[in-house]
């Protein structure tokens, strides 16, 4: 339904303004000058509400606001526009009128993207619902954005233009000068000595690599090369060459590789020319006129020769500071922050949550188990607290106070004291009085517990009298009850009831708990008796008065039984003075006054009164000696008996007061009996003897304390020994002392709460506790745990409601300290014990035992609950992991101490013990840390499969089960992540170790150089120096592997070794520091507790003969010289027992004397660290000496040379200062000579190195020539590995006839048919997809294409319910537009505001969702392909087509370099490889988490396992493919399609063969002429050796002679290639290599043929994309495509199948592309130079690599071919020389500006051409001043002109052809090649950026709920 949009006119336009004024007004507005606008209005007084008119119909009709908003930003910026708008608005200009296209100012403001202008309009109530003529709302405009110029950085040029550089013509003078310099080097003693010293130092280089990885790798390579030869039994033979062809190639590569390595590693820049020029900043010769100092212009070198010492001092200080100023963050932070934080997190988030769940509102995880344990403990605590009361209760439940026989005895004794003798009926079965206590415990209790019997046994120990009543403990109860139940006149002291509560007001009784149950009975009394203020005695007296128990027999009082009548007069029915007949107080006077009360009354007397009254009421009779019936009841049954007695008799019911009084008496008596029994037991317990029986009682009755609680709460199973410590060793003493006695708040609370617990449950728990009387011993607490765990399942019906009770749970939490009291809390408060902190502390201090198997068995058998199992098992798992982390922490603390020792030794200048003792200990401790890390990882990894064992036994429906399992899963993930961090930081310790080695080697080098520099002769002495280099340890595996990688560590430690090294100590070395570090003075045993000084390897005789310690110090501190070094491995390491690592063989000798060496023998190997600087210093010193010598010594030859140099040249630049020119030439020539000499020395050094290795290995003796010290294969070096394509046969024939080494230049180097060019659509050009250039990016960091600025804030402000869903004339909503702009931010904003991506459709019936699907699917199809080539062909083909079309130029006769179309596809592959490498090496904000996530995605979708470097480039599985690419390595294979190539060595070999034949013939003659057997034997050996050499030469000749080959690549060649590929994969461990370094290193291991390289690239292009794991972008796009297919929305089907895992994968991919986006955008945000923009530098390096791969070989051959043909066409050349190759060789060897033609084409030209054609240079690059492309290539012409054989002038045909045709062709080729490489990179990056934006939108869409 359409919405009517009325036009609202707020300000009517002015109608009467003159046209000219109106036109001028709008013109003034369009100036953007607010002052002019104001002045115009002031002058013309015009109105503001006018409309701009046009002479044409339907003019614009724009308001002034329109005019302002349409101003170009260059005329008025946004601030100016706003100022003008505000002014116009203030003056009345209409702000809400449309123009003729219905465009409103709000539309223009939205398009202008200025937030302030939008805010101003909205503030002025401008409607945002306006539509233009195409129905676009302002929101449409805002989403579309503002097109802006794409960003391009301003380039700053040089103010001063570049100056011309003079060029010196070279001629014979230079040759003479060079010869003179050579003579000077040979004859001048000082210069010669320095030169010999320098050369011999170079020759010592192999010794500098002794025992290093480099040497070991070299040995391995040699073994690989020679294995086949040495194992060949037929060697030497005629087939020798065939069997060695592969090895020959490998050895060639090896020699070259070692040469390159040494140059890069040790001799950086040594053989590079020095920058020698006038007005330099360094050294210059001293002349007679310079007054001892060179003038500024005479300074020809960049630096003074002694600059090196400042440089070395700085380097030394840097190395030292790196060690002593080390930031110990890697270890300190680990031990003080990282690991403690991890352990705290484990405590808080896992252990505490599992056990206590302190923050849970309800019981979760394992808290119910904790609450259950606390319940059991509290019940048992209650049992222990109440055992004595309970025992008393049971005694009173089972015993009468006295039996009838006992009562009779009392009566018969006239109620006097009991006779304590055998006459008493002992152990009367029914009487408490008179029963032996121990027998009572054994025989009378029901129920009876083990503790009762234990107590009985102890009683018998204390009082063995069990057959009579005595004074012992067994008679205690009888003895203490006697005073209660005897005559009040008892001389033993009867108890007097008058002294107790019975003689106080009855109301006082109610405060006593035992009486409270009788309180309500007072209401049943008759009113006269309800006065609670009278005493029990008074109420009894009153009752007797009422009853008047007058016992009369006939008319006579029954004196014997009537105890109530006193005297014989008027009866007074009173409380009798005594109930006992015949008492002295009974009868006639002189007794007490009639009617008074006696002051003594016993329990026995009271009961007899009560019984007498009952008798009287019921029968009217009294038997004064009758056994009271209540005594016939068990003591605790008295109250029920009395109730029953009175309730069953109507007569008694008349006197409820009697019942009431009787019950009070009964209760009072029960209390007295209870007190007696309790007191007797207490007496026993206070006096327990020392005996096992007594200990059992103690254990049982000892109160529970906090130690019990912690034992049970700790995960199973704490080591019981930890709880049985005593004295000062007892760390739990405070817990044991905190008893659960009545003063404990929790216990006190529970004594009340227990009354709410079912008695049945309590009784069952009591039965558990009494099953084994020894369970409560601290050493047996595990039994208590077992009781709890095994019973809680059966008792769950009782337990569950208790622990779910909030009062119970909160009370426990209060005790734990986890209850948060509300501010207004009025409930019970329980003192907090802060249980959790102490609990966590105990975890650290206590050992635990592994009980998983036991628990699993119990779970299977149903003996424990699943929750118990999970809580205990996971609790142990968490705790065990934490304790293992604690071990790591402790080890890191030791490492910190070791590092401190290193620093202390360095500061003390005590160097010997650092590598000898401390560094191996550091490595050992590192191994300990790694072992512990792997131990944790092993625990984590094993726990997952363990879960399978119990998974089926756990009920998933119980929430706590799932909570604990999920908590465990999270724990595993968390700890694994933390272990990676710990491991990574730990491995940094190796870097520190190697920094220390670096410093020690630097120190030795510094000592040597300083000594050499200060020495006056050739005998050099120094001290405190190692005579050889210490070897750093290889880096351990950089990432934490899934399995313990101890084998790799073992490999590292095997190489952790030294050669034989001696330390030369200073006799004044201060060794005081050693006393503290090594604890000297006590027995030398362990260093820092980490490693024993005992060695397990070769006997060191340290510190004394036959001793084998690693330390040369005796216990008294004496340092011993140990003269014999031991080479070998530092540490003995056992994979199965890594913690047992010990010192092994390596031992550095210690000698207290100076180190001496002869300077002429070169520097010792320990100069290694400063070798580059030192050799550069020596080189400059020699140059200085040569120049200075010639300046100072003008002998005849020198003067002649000097004069010739002075006259050399025709330019005038230096005519006024000819001496400077001479200095420069002499310096440059000397530099050139030294460079060549040093290069020769380096190669000789490498050859000697290889010879020494092979000569010392018996396996290679048969291929060694000991006379000439050469190796056969080295002598067989063949450099003619040439590639033949089409051939200029005439030229080739000419070349072959002269044995030219330059055959390749005769081959056709251009593609004669462009249709043959690969990777192009030249004959079928498809339309290029231009949207690559037109993607609408919000970023301003792009140079080309259309760039748009979109302000999300403005978009948000222009959204309302109408604009959000408004359609324009195309039916597109703002969301359609945002998607078409591929702007994820705007898409997200619109969706958050409620935009519907499914409902609204445009005129093409597309919803926004449809549109997005179409866009992303079309986009992803662009790089879809099943091969590498197919995945990128949509990029390289269009650009190759452009390249070819631009190269096909008539000016260059349509010549196109062969293989030039390989450049772009290879660059696109390299781009993929580059980001693969960035991801693997975490560059440009890539992280290990992102890398691991991408790896998991590739593993899931493609089953790809990534490697760090793109080694998939070299993985060729099919031998057929391998054979094809290897054919280029064999000249004979190329001969099949060309002509035979002859090696220039053929004639040399023929000469050698002739010489060998001559030697053999003459030696044979000599042998015939001698009879000396020894001489004959010697000659035979020589002949045999010569024959072997002859065989080799014949083989060489045979190889070089033309044959039609019968085979190409054999299996050995294929095997060799595969071996090389394996070598790449296995040996490239240096993570610092960039992509180009990797290619150079990897290709270098395979071969040196450019054809081979191209074939490898070609085969990779045809590789299945799934086998090209480094093609990261196409592979990721396949994954994205898969995810797109999971989210569908069309007319027929709507579904979203994307899982949570898919969404996580998509998030990873978006994050990856976001990081790539930042990289691409940063290219332009960084400075536009190679020094400050590493991205541009890498792009530069890529293009240089491609130039050298594709252009350089061909360009070189074209150039040489042109030179050759030019010489061939010259009659003068044919006349002067017979062999044109001599001229070519001379041209190639000629140097211009220090570079030969070859070095310029390969090393200079690629870099220079890329810089020039991209206009990107370094900051100080002088090449930036080159003004024409011809200047870039000019050195080629200049080099050709410099040859000494043929004078080539600028007018010669050769030079003209080069200048006019060849060089322009080169320029065109290089320029277009470079430009289109850059263009392809740019396009590919645009595609990647669009991929990011579309993928981000996909991520947003994936989270939408698609409506059904």
From Swiss-Prot:
Cellular component aspect of the GO annotation: virion component
Keyword Glycoprotein assigned: no
Assigned keywords, A-Z: ANK repeat, Coiled coil, Repeat, Virion
Coiled-coil regions, chain positions: 1539-1603
Pfam families for the chain: Ank, Ank_4
Localization of this protein: Virion
ANK repeats: 20-50, 60-97, 101-130, 134-167, 1370-1399
Main location: virion
Highest taxon of source: Viruses
Full protein name: Putative ankyrin repeat protein L484
Originating species: Acanthamoeba polyphaga mimivirus (APMV)
């Amino acid at each position: 339904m359409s919405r009517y949009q009325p036009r609202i006119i707020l300000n009517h336009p002015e109608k009467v303004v003159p046209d000219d004024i109106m036109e001028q007004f709008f013109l003034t507005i369009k100036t953007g000058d607010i002052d002019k606008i104001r002045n115009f209005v002031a002058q013309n007084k015009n109105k503001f509400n006018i409309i701009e008119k046009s002479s044409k119909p339907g003019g614009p009709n724009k308001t002034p606001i329109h005019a302002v908003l349409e101003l170009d930003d260059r005329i008025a910026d946004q601030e100016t526009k706003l100022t003008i708008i505000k002014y116009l608005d203030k003056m009345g200009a209409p702000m809400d009128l449309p123009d003729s296209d219905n465009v409103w100012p709000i539309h223009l403001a939205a398009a202008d993207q200025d937030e302030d202008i939008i805010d101003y309009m909205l503030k002025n109530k401008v409607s945002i619902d306006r539509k233009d003529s195409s129905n676009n709302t302002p929101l449409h405009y805002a989403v579309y954005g503002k097109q802006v110029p794409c960003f391009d950085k301003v380039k700053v040029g040089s103010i001063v233009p570049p100056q011309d550089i003079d060029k010196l013509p070279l001629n014979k003078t230079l040759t003479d000068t060079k010869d003179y310099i050579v003579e000077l080097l040979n004859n001048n003693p000082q210069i010669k000595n320095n030169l010999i010293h320098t050369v011999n130092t170079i020759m010592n280089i192999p010794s500098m690599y002794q025992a290093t990885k480099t040497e070991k790798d070299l040995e391995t390579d040699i073994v690989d090369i020679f294995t086949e030869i040495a194992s060949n039994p037929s060697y030497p033979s005629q087939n020798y060459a065939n069997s060695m062809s592969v090895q020959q190639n490998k050895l060639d590569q090896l020699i070259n590789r070692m040469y390159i390595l040494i140059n890069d590693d040790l001799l950086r820049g040594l053989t590079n020319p020095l920058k020698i020029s006038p007005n330099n900043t360094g050294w210059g010769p001293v002349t007679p006129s310079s007054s001892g100092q060179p003038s500024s212009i005479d300074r020809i070198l960049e630096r003074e020769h002694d600059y090196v010492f400042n440089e070395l001092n700085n380097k030394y200080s840097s190395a030292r500071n790196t060690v002593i100023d080390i930031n110990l963050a890697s270890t300190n932070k680990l031990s003080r922050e990282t690991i403690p934080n991890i352990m705290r997190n484990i405590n808080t988030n896992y252990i505490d949550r599992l056990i206590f769940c302190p923050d849970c509102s309800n019981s979760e995880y394992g808290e119910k188990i904790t609450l259950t344990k606390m319940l059991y403990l509290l019940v048992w605590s209650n049992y222990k607290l109440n055992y004595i009361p309970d025992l008393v209760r049971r005694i009173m439940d089972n015993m009468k106070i006295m039996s009838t026989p006992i009562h009779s005895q009392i009566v018969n004794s006239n109620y006097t004291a009991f006779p304590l003798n055998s006459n008493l009926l002992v152990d009367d079965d029914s009487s408490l009085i008179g029963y032996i206590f121990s027998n009572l415990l054994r025989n009378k209790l029901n129920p009876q517990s083990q503790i009762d019997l234990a107590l009985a046994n102890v009683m018998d120990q204390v009082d063995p009298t069990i057959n009579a009543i005595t004074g012992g403990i067994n008679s205690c109860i009888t003895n203490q009850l006697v005073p209660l139940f005897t005559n009040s006149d008892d001389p033993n002291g009867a108890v007097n009831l008058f002294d107790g509560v019975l003689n106080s007001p009855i109301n006082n009784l109610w405060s006593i708990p035992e009486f409270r149950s009788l309180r309500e009975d007072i209401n049943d009394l008759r009113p006269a008796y309800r006065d609670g203020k009278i005493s029990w005695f008074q109420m009894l007296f009153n009752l007797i008065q009422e009853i008047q128990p007058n016992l009369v027999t006939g008319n006579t009082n029954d004196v014997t039984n009537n105890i109530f009548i006193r005297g014989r007069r008027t009866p007074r029915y009173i409380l009798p003075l005594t109930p006992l007949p015949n008492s002295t107080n009974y009868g006639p006077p002189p007794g007490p006054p009639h009617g008074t009360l006696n002051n003594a009354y016993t329990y026995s007397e009271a009961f007899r009164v009560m019984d007498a009254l009952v008798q009287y009421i019921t029968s009217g009779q009294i038997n004064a000696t009758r056994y009271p019936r209540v005594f016939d009841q068990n003591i605790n049954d008295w109250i029920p008996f009395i109730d029953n007695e009175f309730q069953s008799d109507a007569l008694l019911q008349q006197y409820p007061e009697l019942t009431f009084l009787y019950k009070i008496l009964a209760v009072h008596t029960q209390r007295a009996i209870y007190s007696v029994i309790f007191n007797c037991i207490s007496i026993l317990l206070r006096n327990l003897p020392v005996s096992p029986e007594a200990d059992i009682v103690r254990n049982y009755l000892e109160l529970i304390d906090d130690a019990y609680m912690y034992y049970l709460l700790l995960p199973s199973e704490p080591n019981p020994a930890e709880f049985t410590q005593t004295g000062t060793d007892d760390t739990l003493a405070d817990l044991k002392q905190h008893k659960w006695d009545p003063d404990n708040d929790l216990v006190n609370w529970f004594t009340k709460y227990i009354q709410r617990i079912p008695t049945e449950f309590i009784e069952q728990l009591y039965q558990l506790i009494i099953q084994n009387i020894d369970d409560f011993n601290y050493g047996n607490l595990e039994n208590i745990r077992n009781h709890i765990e095994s019973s809680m399942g059966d008792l769950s019906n009782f337990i569950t409601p208790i622990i779910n009770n909030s009062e119970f749970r909160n009370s426990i939490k209060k005790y734990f300290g986890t209850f948060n009291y509300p501010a207004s809390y009025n409930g019970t408060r329980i003192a907090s014990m802060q249980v959790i902190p102490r609990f966590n502390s105990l975890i650290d201090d206590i050992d635990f035992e592994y009980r998983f198997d036991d628990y699993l068995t119990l779970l299977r058998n149903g003996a424990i609950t699943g929750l118990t199992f999970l809580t205990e098992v996971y609790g142990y798992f968490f705790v065990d992991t934490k304790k293992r982390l604690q071990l790591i922490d402790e080890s890191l603390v030791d490492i910190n101490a070791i590092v401190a020792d290193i620093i202390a030794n360095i500061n003390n200048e005590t160097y010997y013990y650092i590598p000898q003792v401390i560094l191996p200990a550091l490595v050992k401790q590192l191994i300990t840390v790694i072992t512990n890390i792997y131990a944790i990882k092993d625990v984590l990894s094993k726990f997952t499969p363990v879960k399978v064992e119990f998974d089926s036994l756990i009920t998933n429906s119980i929430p706590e089960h799932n909570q604990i399992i999920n908590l465990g899963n999270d724990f595993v993930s968390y700890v694994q992540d933390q272990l990676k961090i710990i491991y990574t930081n730990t491995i940094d310790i190796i870097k520190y170790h190697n920094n220390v080695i670096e410093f020690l080697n630097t120190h030795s080098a510094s000592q040597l150089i300083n000594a050499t520099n200060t020495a006056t002769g050739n005998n050099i002495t120094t001290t405190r120096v190692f005579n050889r280099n210490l070897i750093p340890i290889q880096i351990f595996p950089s990432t934490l592997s899934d399995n313990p990688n101890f084998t790799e560590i073992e490999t590292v430690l095997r190489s952790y070794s030294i050669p034989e090294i001696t330390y030369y100590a200073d006799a004044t070395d201060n060794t005081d520091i050693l006393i503290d570090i090594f604890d000297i003075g006590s027995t030398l045993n362990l260093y820092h507790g980490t490693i024993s000084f005992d060695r397990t390897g070769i006997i060191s005789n340290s510190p004394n003969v036959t001793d084998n310690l690693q330390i040369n110090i005796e216990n008294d501190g004496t340092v011993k010289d140990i003269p014999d070094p031991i080479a070998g491995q530092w540490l003995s390491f056992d994979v199965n027992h890594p913690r047992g690592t010990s010192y092994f063989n390596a031992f550095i000798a210690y000698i207290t004397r100076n180190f001496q060496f002869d300077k002429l023998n070169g520097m010792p190997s320990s100069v290694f660290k400063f070798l580059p600087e030192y050799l550069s210093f020596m080189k400059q010193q020699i140059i200085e000496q040569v120049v200075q010598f010639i300046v100072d010594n003008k002998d005849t030859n020198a003067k002649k040379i000097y004069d010739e140099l002075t006259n050399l040249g025709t330019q005038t630049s230096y005519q006024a200062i000819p001496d400077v020119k001479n200095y420069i030439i002499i310096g440059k020539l000397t530099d050139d000579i030294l460079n060549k000499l040093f290069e020769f020395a380096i190669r000789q050094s490498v050859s000697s190195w290889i010879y020494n290795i092979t000569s010392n290995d018996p396996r290679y003796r048969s291929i060694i020539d000991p006379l000439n010290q050469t190796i056969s294969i080295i002598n067989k070096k063949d450099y003619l590995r040439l590639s033949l394509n089409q051939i200029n046969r005439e030229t080739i024939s000419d070349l072959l006839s002269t044995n030219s080494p330059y055959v390749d230049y005769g081959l056709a180097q251009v593609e004669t048919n462009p249709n043959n060019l690969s990777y192009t659509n030249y004959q079928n050009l498809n339309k290029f997809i231009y949207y690559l250039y037109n993607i609408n990016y919000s970023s301003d960091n792009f140079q080309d294409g259309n760039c748009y600025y979109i302000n999300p804030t403005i978009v948000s402000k222009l959204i309302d319910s109408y604009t959000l869903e408004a359609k324009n004339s195309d039916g597109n909503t703002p969301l359609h537009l945002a998607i078409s702009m591929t702007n994820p931010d705007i898409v997200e904003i619109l969706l958050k505001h409620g935009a519907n991506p499914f409902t609204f459709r445009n005129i093409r019936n597309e919803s926004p969702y449809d549109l997005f699907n179409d866009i992303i699917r079309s986009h992803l199809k662009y790089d879809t392909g099943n091969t590498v080539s197919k995945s990128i062909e949509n990029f390289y083909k269009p650009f190759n087509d452009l390249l070819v079309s631009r190269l096909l130029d008539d000016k260059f006769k349509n010549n196109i370099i062969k293989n030039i179309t390989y450049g772009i596809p290879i660059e696109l592959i390299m781009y993929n490889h580059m980001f693969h490498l960035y991801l693997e090496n975490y560059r440009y904000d890539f992280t290990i988490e992102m890398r691991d996530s991408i790896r998991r995605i590739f593993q899931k979708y493609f089953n790809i396992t990534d490697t760090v470097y793109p080694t998939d480039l070299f993985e060729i599985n099919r031998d057929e493919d391998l054979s094809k690419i290897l054919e280029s390595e064999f000249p004979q294979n190329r001969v099949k399609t060309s002509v035979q190539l002859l090696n220039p060595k053929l004639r040399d070999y023929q000469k050698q063969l002739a010489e060998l034949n001559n030697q053999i013939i003459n030696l044979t003659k000599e042998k015939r002429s001698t009879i000396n057997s020894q001489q004959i034997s010697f000659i035979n050996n020589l002949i045999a050796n010569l024959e072997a050499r002859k065989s080799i030469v014949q083989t060489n000749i045979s190889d070089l002679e033309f044959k039609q080959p019968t085979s190409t690549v054999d299996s050995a060649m294929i095997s060799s290639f595969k071996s090389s590929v394996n070598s790449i994969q296995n040996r490239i461990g240096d993570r610092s290599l960039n992509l180009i370094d990797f290619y150079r290193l990897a290709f270098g291991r395979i071969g040196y043929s450019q054809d081979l390289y191209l074939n490898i690239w070609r085969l990779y292009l045809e590789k299945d994309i799934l086998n090209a794991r480094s093609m990261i972008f196409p592979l990721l796009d396949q994954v994205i495509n898969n995810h797109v297919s999971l989210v569908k929305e069309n007319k027929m089907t709507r579904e979203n199948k994307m899982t949570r895992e898919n969404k996580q994968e998509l998030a990873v991919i978006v994050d990856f592309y976001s990081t790539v986006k930042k990289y691409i955008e940063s290219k332009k945000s960084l400075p536009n130079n190679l020094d400050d923009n590493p991205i541009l530098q890498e792009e530069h390096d890529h293009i240089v690599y491609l130039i050298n791969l594709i252009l350089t070989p061909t360009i070189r051959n074209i150039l040489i071919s042109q030179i050759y043909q030019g010489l061939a066409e010259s009659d003068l050349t044919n006349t002067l020389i017979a062999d044109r190759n001599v001229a070519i060789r001379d041209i190639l060897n000629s140097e211009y500006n220090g570079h030969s033609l070859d070095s310029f084409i390969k090393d200079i030209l690629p870099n220079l051409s890329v810089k020039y054609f991209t206009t990107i240079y370094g900051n100080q690059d002088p090449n930036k001043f080159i003004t024409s492309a011809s200047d870039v290539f000019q050195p080629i012409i200049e080099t050709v002109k410099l040859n000494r054989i043929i004078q080539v002038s600028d007018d010669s045909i050769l030079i003209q052809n080069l200048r006019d045709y060849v060089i322009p062709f080169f320029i065109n080729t290089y320029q277009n090649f470079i430009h289109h490489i850059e263009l392809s990179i740019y396009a590919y990056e645009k595609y990647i950026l669009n991929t990011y934006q579309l993928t981000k939108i996909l991520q947003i869409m994936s989270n939408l709920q698609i409506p059904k």
